[in-house]
């Protein structure tokens, strides 16, 4: 897919990995819808920077834990930009809540944002994407491919994203491709100290941490070159999953 001039919606695009995706897609000439949940200031700053550089970008706030807001978001993008070519479902929450401590509200919040929202966003975006042979990229992580004992709701939600990717790939073919990226240690939690970072590096076969650019390159591959790839989850973890 030639990206220049096309429109991408990146959920959770105001911070961290989502921001890296936004900046990369804008750099490819895409017009970018930057979704945010609670990070309005960050989203506005990202868009201001992009506009100063000559890119076309706009912010769209929505609490994706609310099904009504998730369902309505794609139509807002189309109303603003006139089309939608790419959906990147990167908004997520990763909360450390062991099994015995997980409340119904925590479970629902995590599953609604991480899994339910990507489904309904894809559902509502599908007619627009199909018209232009568009693409969906979901962001999973290693927690969806192995059990994280202290993150039960998160692990379940991301495992669901992996299967959702397969289901949507079949359901939306041949007009839309649907794939996922499962990043490993490409952007570690902000509160990790040097000891934790060193441990992660030493327990990764490639003996280093990744960078956001590693995940960005995976996204660009799927969008620009992966026209015959659908239903797959591309693991970007330096081989870390192999040591489990």
Regions flagged by a language model, labelled:
Residues 141:
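Residue(s) in the substrate-gating loop at a strand-loop-helix junction
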Residues 2-33:
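Canonical Rossmann dinucleotide-binding motif of NAD(H)/NADP(H)-dependent dehydrogenases/reductases
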Residues 145-146, 220, 224-244:
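Short C-terminal tail/terminal secondary-structure segment
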Residues 122, 157, 165:
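Active-site helix of classical SDR
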Residues 127, 169-174:
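Alpha-helical segment proximal to the catalytic Tyr-Lys
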Residues 173-177, 230-231:
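Short, small/polar-rich loop/turn modules that mediate ligand/substrate recognition or access, typified
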Residues 98-99, 106-111, 200:
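Substrate-binding pocket helix/loop in short-chain dehydrogenase/reductase
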